[in-house]
Amino acid sequence: MVSLFKRGKAPPLTKEGPTSKKPPNTAFRQQRLKAWQPILSPQSVLPLLIFVACIFTPIGIGLIVSATKVQDLTIDYSHCDTKASTTAFEDIPKKYIKYHFKSKVENKPQWRLTENENGEQSCELQFEIPNDIKKSIFIYYKITNFYQNHRRYVQSFDTKQILGEPIKKDDLDTSCSPIRSREDKIIYPCGLIANSMFNDTFSQVLSGIDDTEDYNLTNKHISWSIDRHRFKTTKYNASDIVPPPNWMKKYPDGYTDENLPDIHTWEEFQVWMRTAAFPKFYKLTLKNESASLPKGKYQMNIELNYPISLFGGTKSFVLTTNGAIGGRNMSLGVLYLIVAGLCALFGIIFLVKLIFQPRAMGDHTYLNFDDEENEDYEDVHAENTTLREIL
């Protein structure tokens, strides 16, 4: 029976007393931080709604006007290898073309498929620029149905490797799997992103047709400046590494000291490595920021290498100028106008309701007490007044 009443040892005492789970007596831990809790009333809500509508309306209109000034040409050449003629230029089906110019286009874009002695195919695009376009001119490729934002895909590279460090095979980031090694050699650069790099080749000259002069383009400074610092020249020996599987067409005999890619200066690679957030995206490949594009007829030659049929997507050639917020994008301006319209609509509804069906008790003047009411209140709460009398 004695064991039933045996007590355990008490917690050790300290100078501050026994151990306690009480939170520290601070404003944050005790939830005493200062806060602002505004009282929503017609006098405060209506001006706010009207203010937002007045601000968002001109912003939305400005964004739409800026977007409409952007001139662009988009040609989907995904089916050039199957639908284009190999003998003469033919009109491209209308569903593969989209353009916005200040002047009317008289001649429809055309395409033709060519093949050299090595079996390499090229898609030749001819198109008309109906009016002079002021600088700057940008050439993008557009990909659809490609989910670069997949978690495994986004993480599939080795940070130290792209910084130029000669990482050993066993030390490579596991996220590079299954593109880590082949034939007991390290894949450089490893990972799914590098392996799936877009490799259609655009000519760096818009060849003028008839009396139109050639228009030169460049692939310099097409990547973000911060990206150019992320990629460094590798310290690997060419004999210790192999290219990714999908690069074998470009490097059929593997790497040598002469053809080893320098990702520090290879800006097309840097552009591709910055993954897109949506399955439809544009990536810059060429540009000219020094000269305007004269009106006339031009030809762009594209060497076909990228197999979009593997993921059921499309690839397009995009020639465009830029506006205040980039390319031709009406969505942002429309969203601003929608918000402005909703604010104006709710403001009108609240105003009409306030006029025809006011809420009297919502007036703040009812929170003030005059002297007579204070005296009555003090009388009711006198010391000798019982609870029964108050009720």
Curated annotation (Swiss-Prot):
Coarse class of the protein's main subcellular location: Golgi
Disulfide bonds: C80-C123, C176-C190
Ranges for region Confers specificity for binding DRS2: 68-329
Presence of the UniProt keyword Manganese in the record: no
Glycosylated residues in this chain: N199, N216, N237, N288, N329
Cross-referenced InterPro entries: CDC50/LEM3_fam (IPR005045)
Transmembrane segments: 45-65, 332-352
Protein's cellular compartments: Golgi apparatus, trans-Golgi network membrane; Late endosome membrane
Phenotype seen when the gene is deleted: Leads to abnormal trafficking of DRS2 from the endoplasmic reticulum to the Golgi, and decreases DRS2 protein level. Abnormal processing and modification of proteins in the trans-Golgi network. Accumulation of aberrant membranous material probably derived from the Golgi. Sensitive to cold, papuamide B (lipopeptide that permeabilizes phosphatidylserine-containing membranes), and Ro09-0198 (antifungal peptide that targets phosphatidylethanolamine in the outer leaflet of the cell membrane).
Residue ranges, annotated region (Disordered): 1-25
GO CC, any one term: plasma membrane
Membrane-side (Cytoplasmic) residue stretches: 1-44, 353-391
Membrane topology, record value: Multi-pass membrane protein
Record GO biological process: actin cortical patch localization; aminophospholipid translocation; endocytosis; intracellular protein transport; phospholipid translocation; retrograde transport, endosome to Golgi
Entry's family note: Belongs to the CDC50/LEM3 family.
Summary of subunit composition and partner proteins: Component of a flippase complex consisting of DRS2 and CDC50. Interacts with DRS2; the interaction is direct, is required for their mutual export from the endoplasmic reticulum, and preferentially occurs when DRS2 is in the E2P state.
Described purpose of this protein according to its UniProt entry: Accessory component of a P4-ATPase flippase complex which catalyzes the hydrolysis of ATP coupled to the transport of phosphatidylserine and small amounts of ethanolamine from the lumen to the cytosolic leaflet of the trans-Golgi network and ensures the maintenance of asymmetric distribution of phospholipids. Required for the formation of transport vesicles from endosomes.
Identification of the protein by name: Phospholipid-transporting ATPase accessory subunit CDC50
Origin species: Saccharomyces cerevisiae (strain ATCC 204508 / S288c)
